[in-house]
Every structure is written in C-alpha cells, then in structure tokens.
Amino acid sequence: MDYVKIMKYGNIINLTFNIEQDKPFDIGEKMNEICADAYMNGYNWEAFFNYYLGKNYPEILEGIDFDPKAGMFTVYYDYTPENEIKAEKLKAIIIDLIENEEKLYKVIKEEAANIEWD
C-alpha cells in the first residue's frame, strides 16, 4: 500500500503514513463523523496510535519518536534490527486498519473518550 512507507537513512528508520491519500483521508472523515474530536490530522493520528498501540502493541511504542504534521503522520526509530522489526509491524498494523476500516470505526465508537485527542 503506497500510503505507508518505511525509509532507512543513516541511523534512522522513518515510517510515514500519508493521511491525505484518498483512502486514509476518506476513512479519517468517517472517523470524524463518528466522533467530533477525531478530526484526523497527523496530530490526532498520533493520539489514536498512542492509545491503540499502548493498549494492543505496547512493544511498538518502545523507542518511537512521533513527528506528526497537519497532513501526515511520521514516526522515527533509531536504527537497530529490533526497531526495524517494530517499524515493519507498525506498517502492517496501519495497513490492516486502513484495509479493514471497520476496526478503526469500532475503536472510535467504543473507546474515543479514552483517547487524548489534539
């Protein structure tokens, strides 16, 4: 899926989720319809993933640095073999959630009040 990419340069692993591509953007709009606080800019994707990963995949948050922007969600890891695995797992999680968007909507419907939105 071309809306999420991993790049490696120097001692850094960078994962970028392009939230302005059609499919993620449309899903973000639906998430916002479900919960007014969930206007899905990069900062609220950070809030969502902080919550979702913390609850379901806390190991992925170890060593992660978030760098969201209005139109994208980016994370960095220091380059290690372990962090490369984490980045690949995070990419797979993002793809799974976007390709199976009902999972996202379920979290928003049932747990939005637990998320620290921007």
What are these regions (language model features)?
Residues 49, 103-118:
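Short proline/glycine- and acidic-rich turn/helix-capping motifs at secondary-structure junctions
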Residues 8, 29, 33, 92, ...:
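Polar/charged alpha-helical tracts
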Residues 45-103:
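Amphipathic protein-protein interaction modules
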Residues 16-62:
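Surface-exposed, low-hydrophobicity interaction/linker segments
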Residues 1-25:
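N-terminal, charge-rich interaction modules
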